């Protein structure tokens, strides 16, 4: 369990620290208005949703070994984005729409690493349940929340006052490389599990996904459309309230990372 716990903790820390770091980096380029942070959050929320969808499709459609292969390629490709410092070529020009420029800038700067980090929580928890049958993954979920909170609290009080932006970028990039190593260690038992399933005559991805379902999966009823709609509505409402509160604080006080994180 230790390797999965450390991997999920580090990924959650990096996932939430890169948000204020990137926003702080590009803030002066686009005039310092509250809309800059809103555009950043739009990008991060889209990639977060995409990461969850990727994890679901990966674990429900591909064999265990194929999952490791596909995810390994994705993780290795994401290293090409390091270090994550935005290039000056992305600075806006007069009359250009800032939203599209910000989205393209973020995609070119942190897109792949952020997407990989977004996949880690659900993917590693699923891999953990397969390789550790009978052990609950909910402690890993709680640990990811701890890592996220620590990242948000440490940035305005520790990293931003002490390190330059360049040093922050390099520190984050080094820690991301460490995360890649940890993710590889988590993939090893899944690879061995896939080999054992093939030896047992379970070869296809869907067949392996069915055979790896836990007893809890079988007992859990499928949620109704009303329940899923309520989940979607509540999630959207919380995001809207978060952005509205953050924007109002930035308008009334100042556009600084601490106020982005506070809500």
Describe the function of each predicted region.
Residues 1-263:
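Alpha-helical transmembrane segments of multi-pass membrane proteins
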């Amino acid at each position: 369990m230790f390797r999965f716990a450390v991997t999920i903790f580090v990924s959650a820390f990096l996932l939430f620290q890169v948000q204020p770091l990137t926003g702080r980096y590009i803030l002066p380029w686009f005039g310092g208005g509250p809309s800059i942070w809103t555009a950043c959050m739009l990008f991060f929320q889209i990639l977060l949703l995409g990461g969850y969808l990727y994890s679901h499709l990966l674990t429900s459609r591909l064999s265990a070994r194929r999952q490791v292969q596909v995810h390994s390629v994705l993780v290795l490709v994401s290293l090409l984005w390091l270090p994550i410092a935005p290039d000056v070529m992305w600075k806006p020009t007069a009359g250009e729409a800032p939203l599209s420029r910000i989205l393209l800038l973020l995609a070119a700067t942190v897109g792949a690493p952020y997407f990989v980090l977004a996949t880690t929580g659900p993917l590693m928890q699923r891999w953990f349940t397969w390789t550790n049958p009978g052990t609950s993954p909910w402690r890993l979920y709680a640990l990811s929340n701890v890592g996220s909170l620590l990242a948000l609290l440490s940035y305005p009080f520790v990293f931003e006052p002490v390190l330059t932006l360049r040093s922050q970028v390099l520190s984050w990039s080094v820690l991301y490389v460490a995360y890649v190593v940890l993710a590889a260690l988590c993939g090893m038992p899944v690879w061995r599990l896939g080999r054992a399933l093939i030896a047992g005559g379970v070869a296809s991805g869907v067949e392996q996904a069915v055979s790896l379902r836990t007893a809890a999966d079988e007992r859990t009823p499928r949620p109704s459309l009303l329940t899923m709609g309520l989940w979607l509505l509540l999630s959207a409402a919380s995001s809207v309230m978060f952005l509205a509160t953050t924007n109002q604080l930035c308008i009334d006080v100042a556009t600084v990372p601490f106020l982005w994180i506070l809500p």
